[in-house]
Amino acid sequence: MSRFHSYLNAAVAILKQYDGAMPFAANLKQFFAANKKMGATDRRQISDLCYSFFRLGKAGLHLSVDERILAGKFCCTTDDDALLQAVKPEWNSIISDNIVDKLKLLGLDVHEIFPFKDALSDGIDGELFSLSFLQQPHLFIRIRPGNEEVVKRKLLHAGVNFKELSPLCLSLPNATKLDRIIQLNREAVIQDYSSQRVGALLEKLIPRKIKNVWDCCAASGGKSILAKDVLGNINLTVNDVRETILYNLKKRFAEAGIKSYNTIITDLSQRGIEQNDQFDLIIADVPCSGSGTWARTPEQLYYFDKHCIEKYVQLQKSILTNIVSSLKPGGYLLYITCSVFKDENENNVQFLTKNFSLQLNEQIILKGYDMQADTMFAALLSKPYG
């Protein structure tokens, strides 16, 4: 048996015991920890085959596990591949063909990969979004103000190829070990391209002299650091539902040089906070389906049930209901999701304008599927005076 067949058999074994209950990356880590004889090349090849299986999304569900792995590998690969040459040489001979033609050869339809086109937000191209699952997204960093030259110089010195998408946004190879090259969070933050573009809405608030800011679903603090960099000297309050989440945030803030901020630990789906009419800006990067990021974790698409959307919508509405009273008259709510579903995006904006008399200033689909980046939604709303 060739090493390529061994890789395929290992991938089949891993996938047959995986049920989607934990992130697949963590599952792989456990498998490799239990099989220490596998070297770096073995781990890379097996991981690639497993992810090829998931990148087909909902397409080819009738195929056996090994057939689906190879079909995914064929669709996700554009250059001559040694494994395909050994196992499916007839496919390897046409490896550079158009991806839609490849799918047709396999009897698959591009729209089967992500079959929820009717649920998409307006303006998202269903076919292009489906095709984006067949490529691994890039790694992006946002250079923090004043560090542009030093970060680029360090990357060049380390021999890292990068693409400059804007003066502060760089796209890099996924395997780049940034922590060995730059001061992460101090000089630059790892932040997806679309997530960085939320800063354009924050920039519109610079003339408003925003002072008191509440990042109500702060997670690891990426939007808070962005707000600090864009808006300058703000009084920052961060909240999340668990102490462990804020522990990671505090570590990141320390690395970023952010020392002055307030913390709250509360479940905003159950209750609000006591500070009514306090904040000039509330950033609500709410829990969501994460569907705009699934090209990074394609197992989530494979296991996704459309009925789960409503669960997220109800959670989002509960959080929004409990935070609006903390917004000052004349203040702003920045609503953000990494979802592509209309119910989590535009429909929640309508919920806010209808039930809380908020005014919509701007909403935008941050398309990343044509840039090997995440796709997100952001809306800036304001609370009228009086």
PLM segments and residue spans:
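S-adenosylmethionine
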Residues: 1-386
